[in-house]
Every structure is written in structure tokens, then in C-alpha cells.
């Protein structure tokens, strides 16, 4: 990288003030839930990654401290410690003025994940306290802040050093992050591991010093994104070794790695200056366009596609593909769509990636002739399967019209009276008996009931054409009415929420997993929009007394049960619910369907790589990885079933009191 870039006090450029951050934190970090909390860490880590990205330093240490604060330390150049042109110490400017940083000037960084990066100042604004320690020019400097960004000390010189780098320690403000200020090791782990995959020379250490949670992990990958693709494909049957190529065009560096597996869905992970672009963008478009064009040219050259044959569709070519596309774009060309970094808008990136892939991929296909021919045949089979499923797809897309009538006539769906798709809810209910209670107990205005009577197919192992043959899944597709797979359009959904309601036993849990696998693989935008939920019926019913003095209570956990038992004293009757059908309509409404009193679990995808790997482990063909995961993560005891509430990763929402910034 360009080491002549001048990272000095004058390269820090002030764009605007910081006043609104504490008042409207969601505008700056997306939310104040678990995602927003961890986003604070990523902002500081990304500053350290920018140093490595530009050739300065190669180590980042992240430590969750005993008191719940977190430290991020690098061995880069260290923040500038002089006086800024505004008259304040530069460190104070960086931590108290929004959008103040080297990435906004012309000189601090050649490339960065910046532009909309809110950085250190927002982290400071949303912290109870923050401290920064800088090793630079042979000296150690220190400054502290408190109460959401107010300096509690000036920049002071503490001693001498032979090191360089920056260490930032902060404790999130619990008046902002009211749900929790506790950092999740696994959530941080996935993001930090990702950064290490993308920069070959980067070494990252993650420590947890909290009592009872002590843990340490190291991430360093000498083969970079090649190892990243292998990691994503773990547990899958791969068809060849990982292919990699890189190049430069239009001043943009391009790195690509890919590998095909025997499954039917694609997984493309794209990055810009080490920042994940989960909504894709121009670089991803360039990759897909070039790959489609090169594969079609090759298929015709080897005569697998005749003159009269239609070109292969990109979706067919990418069936079973896992790829990582990473680009590094100079600051002056960097452009994202919207206020987040989730979608790249730089037009030059499309032609750059297209150029590199179009230049390198043909040589790879020629060199691996036998493999390439089999990949072309695989794509042709996918095309034939897509054509076979086309009619069913179009039926699913028009689910609101013709097929909706068929579904209603079949007697399966009990629709809501309202046509307001923004408020309507669809309950997917296990079994006819529970479905009957749900129909009688629901609020007819906005709640629709779809009983699931037959076997739900495992969509992890099935092609789309086979999925359409499964009556239960087909009915769900038509009922939701927004299409499926690449045709799915969330804006066409008939329902704002899809709620899975099953018995609290192993069969019910299995149905939940099968349905979640389907939604994750074929209606992913619904999950990403936080619109898929799991209903949580009570496990116990307690009754005491008769007539007017009769008291009925419900418990969702063993802890609640113990509390109620002590509260009620002797003489109560206890019922352990094994199935939804054991509740009458009134009880089902009051405990599980009434928005005022019910408890829902919102299904969220924290990280698609981890989620995809977990689905493959639990629902794929290979038995050994599944056995190992179960032995590691599941505790077997005398109880028949374990409450889903025992899972610390589950986010429980009681009484439908949703944080507006979460929805």
C-alpha cells in the first residue's frame, strides 16, 4: 500500500457535530439492540483494520474485560497526538466530532471502509466512559471521556514507549442500550474471523476475561479468502479445490475465490475494503455478469450448448457455488448506496471485477477441462429443473390470485378478514386439533391460520422442483403469495408476520427447524426483515380454588413455575402441557396469540455464514458433523424436553413490546 500517505493532525477533516447521536442513536448504528451494541466494536475495529489495509501494523487484539467494558488494540501508527487546526487536540476531535477522521481527508488513507463510517465519535457518544491510549513518536499518550463523550481529562503524556499503535477501551451506556450491554463472544468472533480471512497478514486475538466466560481465540489465515471459501463449505460435498484469482483494473484491486458444492443454492459473500456488503452492489453484479458470459461462451465452444439452445441463466450457472468477492477501492471512488455500507454503488467496481473475472476465468476453465465440462452439464441440468419448475414458480408468484382461491377452497387456510398486509399475521400451526383451537381462539380481523397436516420436506437436501411437490411447503408458498427462491419479493407478501406455532416437544422442535430451514434458504428476505417468529406456548398451567376464588396461572419456564408454586402455596393442581391441542381456544388466545399477553421469539440472522454452516451441519447429509455438534452443545438430562428459553442466543419478546428501532 501507499506508505507515503500523510496521516497527520492536518489530515483530520471535520464534517459535522455530534449533538444528535445520543438523542437518535438508531440513525447512526441502526438500533440499540444486540446488533447496535456490537456495531460499536466494529467501528473501532474497522479503524484498526484500515491501518492494516494501508500497510501499517498487522495485529489487532480485542478483549472483553472483567467489568464488561471492551478494549481494541492495534500496532498501527497510533492516532495523531498534536493540535488540530480547530485548536483542540486531534485525539479530542476524533472522539468528539462526528465524521472526523483520516478517511475523510485526502492523505490519511488510500483505501478505507469509510465514507458513511461513523467511527470513534459515535462510540464515545454512546458510552458510559471511554479511554484511549496512544503509542506514537516514542511516547505514550492518554485521554479519557465520560457521560457520552465529554472529556474528563486532557491529552496527557504518560511515559516512553518503543511500540506504536492505538488502544481504545469503552463501556456502553446502559441508558442507551437498555436491553443489554453484555458483549457476545460468538457474535464478535464471526466478524473478527471474517476480517482475518480478508487480510492474509492480519493476526487477530479475541479474549474474554469475564468470570466464568474465560476464553481466547486467534485468527490468522495465510491463504486468505481461499481458506474463507473452504470454511463456508465445511460439511458440504465439494466438487473441486478452491479456485482463486486476483487482478487490478481502474485502480481497483480485485480478489475472487470460488468453489462448487453438490447443493442447490448459491452463497456469494462480497466485501469492499474489508467491509461486508450484505446487499451486494456493483462489484457483485460485475462478478455475476462476467461468470455468466464466460460460462456460456465456454459451453458453446465445447458444444454442450448448440446454436439453437438458449444461453444458460446466471442462476443455473451459480447453483451450488460458494464465492468470495473482495475489492479495494480508493477513497475518491468509494460510493455506497444509502446511509449504510451494505450495498456498493461505485460504478467503476462493476467493470473492474468484470474485467478481472473475464480475463482469468477462461484460462481456469480450459486448464480444468474435465471439471469445467461437468460444471457446464450441472448448469444445464439446473436449467432443465428450472424450466420444469417455472409453471409452479409463476403460480406461487400469483398466489394472491388464482392459487389463493384454490388454497382457500381446499379448506386449509382460514384467512384474516382484513386486507391490510401491514398488520396481518399468518400462524403456521402443527396439527389439525391445535389448528382448530387456533381458528376459534384467534382475532379474526388480522390473524390467519394454516394448519400443517403432513410431512414438511427438508429443503436443505432438496431442489426447488422437488420442494414444489411437497404439499405443505407448496401451500405455505401460495399462502404467503410472494414467490419463492430468486423470485421471492417481500413487498408482495400477504402477511407482516409469519408465526410458527408447534407443540413443546421434540416433534414440534423438528417442525420448527424444517420450516426455518425453508424460510432461510428460499424466503431469506422475510427472515432478514425480522418477520418470522416462533410462538412460545406455556409449559405449565396452575389452578387453585373454585368458583369466584379460582385462580389460573401459566408458567413458561421452570423458574416461573417454582415462583408460582411458592406464591400459590398448597392445594393447587399442576398440568404440564405436551401439546397445543390440550388448550381450549380461550387459553390458546390468552397465552399464545393475544398480542397483549403472548411471548414471541423473533428469528434473526446475526451472520449468514454462521447460519448457513449451522443449517448444513444440522440438516445436511453428513452424520458425523451433526453428531459432534450435538455432543458439544446439547446437555442430556432426565427431562424429556428442554425449554427453548434455556438457549442464551434466543431473543425473547414479551407481550409484543417491540423496540421500534428493532423492527
UniProtKB/Swiss-Prot annotation:
Pfam families to which the protein is assigned, alphabetical: DNA_gyraseB, DNA_gyraseB_C, HATPase_c, Toprim
Keyword set includes Cell inner membrane: no
Sorted UniProt keywords: ATP-binding, DNA-binding, Isomerase, Magnesium, Metal-binding, Nucleotide-binding, Topoisomerase
Residue stretches of biased makeup (Basic and acidic residues): 387-398
GO terms for biological process, alphabetical: chromosome segregation; DNA topological change
Entry superkingdom: Bacteria
Site (Interaction with DNA): 455, 458, 510, 626
Region of interest (Disordered), residue spans: 386-416
Signal sequence, renumbered to the chain: none
Binding-site positions, Mg(2+) 1: 430, 503
Binding site for ATP: 7, 47, 74, 114-120, 341
Domain Toprim: 424-538
Catalytic activity: ATP-dependent breakage, passage and rejoining of double-stranded DNA
GO CC term (a single one): chromosome
Top enzyme category: isomerase
Binding site for Mg(2+) 2: 503, 505
Keyword Metal-binding recorded: yes
Cofactor dependency: Mg(2+); Mn(2+); Ca(2+)
InterPro entries associated with the record: DNA_gyrase_B_C (IPR002288), HATPase_C_sf (IPR036890), ParE_type2 (IPR005740), Ribosomal_Su5_D2-typ_SF (IPR020568), Ribsml_uS5_D2-typ_fold_subgr (IPR014721), Topo_IIA (IPR001241), Topo_IIA-like_dom_sf (IPR013760), Topo_IIA_B (IPR000565)
Job of this protein: Topoisomerase IV is essential for chromosome segregation. It relaxes supercoiled DNA. Performs the decatenation events required during the replication of a circular DNA molecule.
The protein's name: DNA topoisomerase 4 subunit B
Species: Staphylococcus aureus (strain MSSA476)
